[in-house]
């Protein structure tokens, strides 16, 4: 039985895992289970959690099931929290993951004749936020000239840390940073993003 205030990170992560399994072997049971869970996310307004795994899920499941409700969920998950993400002083890497996944999904919506669903969302503000986060998160990168001041520079050089949590380095934070930056770089290479940061209104 779930606690009333339990976080939902693992729910989204589990569904994302099912969708990646489906991508590998095309066994319909994975997609059916993911869709059933995603319907639950929609019923219970999970988008209000603004979680990066939910953005990953929405981006992934709409590749196979282009349900407008799924797209709408993904858009709300990001845009309802966009000004907060833009202005946040922490270097949490999941913000970049969330916004980049939303951008990827919105690009597909443009090509799948779903522009009508995009009218209520300021896509330019999403791009500004992505660029701001990509630049800002470098405040949490252990450049050699920073790592040298720590006890074991070789161990942390080139990794990522969370400054407001005592310069903590954890493998999941490093993974989230790499994941976000790889997807960000991919969009830049495709010419789908500008590298210039601007102010979100």
List the predicted regions and their residue ranges.
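Extended ligand-binding groove/face enriched in aromatic
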Residues: 1-24, 28-32, 71-72, 132-136, ...
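Solvent-exposed loop and edge beta-strand segments that line ligand/cofactor-binding
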Residues: 1-10, 27, 38-53, 60-67, ...
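Hydrophobic core segments within long, regular secondary-structure runs in both alpha-
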Residues: 12-15, 19, 28-42, 55, ...
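Residue-level signature of the C-terminal ends
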Residues: 21-24, 44, 61-64, 84, ...
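Short linear functional motifs in flexible/disordered or boundary regions
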Residues: 26, 33, 46, 53, ...
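Short, surface-exposed, charged/polar-biased interaction segments
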Residues: 35, 55-58, 62, 75, ...
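CBM-like carbohydrate-recognition segments
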Residues: 69, 90-201
